[in-house]
Design a protein with these regions (language model features):
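Hydrophobic packing positions in regular secondary-structure scaffolds
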Residues: 1-167
């Protein structure tokens, strides 16, 4: 779909983009050429821009911000939720193409003392908003101590086993 939008003239692009459902609009926006993205951003009202930004994953928002002129970046950041704005700024501090610049901050975090059953419930509650749910990061005090997968959790026969015991 993004390729079609990249070929539209400046007058039709915003009109057709506004017809897309919200989630599809965000997915399409991410895949568009920076020139088309900028054209749309300049034509969006603040509320339209906020709707698109709110649907993006942080790393996708960072990719967009990196391609835009400063005045457009300022407008994007002003419409982003405070938490997203903070995450965007954190990722932008890393050198381009470094591990930090391509990482995602939207993942499922589990505590080592959680049970498998609690972990599955947490994934169900929070996973919808995460970009990565297949690998779960086990943390203690915001420090990574290990990994486990959704597969490991689902195949564990003891729902009362701790995450620490299966990672």
């Amino acid at each position: 779909i993004a390729a079609v939008f990249d070929e539209l003239n400046e007058a039709r692009l915003p009109l057709l983009f506004r017809l897309l459902p919200k989630e599809l609009a965000a997915e399409t926006f991410v895949e568009m050429e920076p020139e088309a993205q900028e054209l749309l951003i300049r034509g969006f009202s603040d509320s339209e821009l906020k709707e698109v930004i709110d649907e993006l994953y942080v790393d996708d928002a960072v990719d967009i911000v990196e391609e835009m002129p400063a005045n457009v970046v300022q407008r994007i950041l002003s419409q982003a939720e405070p938490d997203m704005r903070k995450q965007i700024n954190e990722i932008l501090r890393y050198p381009e193409d470094s591990a930090g610049s391509i990482m995602t901050t939207e993942y499922v975090s589990l505590r080592p003392n959680m049970t498998v059953g609690e972990a599955i419930l947490r994934i169900r509650r929070t996973g919808i908003d995460k970009e990565t749910i297949y690998t779960c990061y086990v943390t203690r005090g915001h420090k990574l101590i290990g990994l486990t997968s959704v597969k490991d959790l689902l195949l564990c026969e003891d729902d009362d086993a701790t995450i620490e015991s299966i990672m």
